[in-house]
Amino acid sequence: VLMPCYNAAATLDEALSSLVQQTLPDFEIIAVDDGSADATSGILRDWASREPRLRVLSCSHAGIVEAINFGLQACTADYIARMDADDLARPERLELQAAYLDAHPEDCLVSCRVAGFPDGQVREGFSIYIDWLNSLLSDEDIRREIFVESPLPHPSVMLRREWLQRVGGYQEHGWAEDYDLWLR
């Protein structure tokens, strides 16, 4: 799991808790503190002292693309699951996604449905976007809709490290790094 963190003290404990509850037994968490000015660094150090799967990296604040690419260099697994420090993962997420990629070697990534939270605080426009994302259930759906908007919620994706390296990793072009990656 590759998780960039920037001023994430308010949400980081919940995000990490959801990861350590995964049903997949063998995985690593690479958390990159992107020069946070809040308590993010201390929270990560505390978690790392009691969670052997967590490796914490720190860099000066340069933005999400630089933080992700910095963390990518430390990833050793064949599959990389993306998650942000303000996201939660259902316990079976990693296990199901890894099983899918194992069974489908022709696919470079897999995503999953998402939900907005906390309940009652998700704005109407974002709720409509989430409904649209969750309606894309097949490769054909994604291919048809890819030029409408980014059809894959980045923090829900697991991808093959080899594919990610082959297409040039994450690139900074002034627009969404995930959408840029999907278009390549």
PLM-predicted stretches and their roles:
Residues 80:
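Short aromatic/hydrophobic "clamp" motif used to bind/position activated sugar donors
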Residues 59-75, 96:
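Glycine-rich, basic loop-to-helix element that forms the pyrophosphate-binding segment
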Residues 73, 129-184:
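Conserved nucleotide-sugar donor-binding catalytic segment
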Residues 92-126:
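Conserved donor NDP-sugar-binding/catalytic core segment of glycosyltransferases
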Residues 17-26:
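Short, acidic, metal-binding catalytic loop of nucleotide-sugar glycosyltransferases
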Residues 10-13, 38-46, 88, 92:
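Acidic helix N-cap motif at the loop->helix transition within catalytic regions
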Residues 18, 33-42, 84:
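A conserved acidic beta->alpha catalytic loop
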Residues 26-35, 55-59, 85:
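Short beta-strand/loop segment that forms part of the nucleotide-sugar
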